[in-house]
Amino acid sequence: MQHKSRAIIATLCLVTASVGASSGRLAAQSAPHLVPASIQNAQKETLEQLGSLAAKPGAVGVEAGKVLVLLKNHAARENEFILPPLTLLPYLADGKVTPDMAWALPMIDRVKAEREQIFNEHAELTEALNGLIVAATAANDQDAKEFAENAAADSLADMEILEPTILLIGETLRSKLPAPH
């Protein structure tokens, strides 16, 4: 329970910092662009859990180590250009589109251009997570198995929900911003 309380407090601190940093300048963020605090917190927690699993002896540790390498690389790419446009969602949901949001368009264009590569990264990550599930099942490590199953579901959600959402953000911006965006 104490761990969850700390996670909630950390999330609130990140949200407060994000709101404070963005007040007075709607979406005119300077590079590097922010990633939504909830996603930052989830990434951090996932990488910490995976690090603990990778430190385990035997096949579970080996397979978790493989996933950790893939996930760190993918998370770095996500933080670079995939996730920052999501910070615009609260504004878009309120019907607010301003010219200073155009910073997101090159990132969104990159997501669109690299869809196949992003898909392949998720497929490789899912394959590695399946290896962790097999190792965890053989080792009777229910925690590792559940972690891998949940991480695989998160990866699928990225492809089914996150990527299309980012592309819709781009379409919304392009339809409401003045040309040449």
Segments (PLM) and residue ranges:
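Small-residue-biased structural context
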Residues: 2-6, 13-15, 20-181
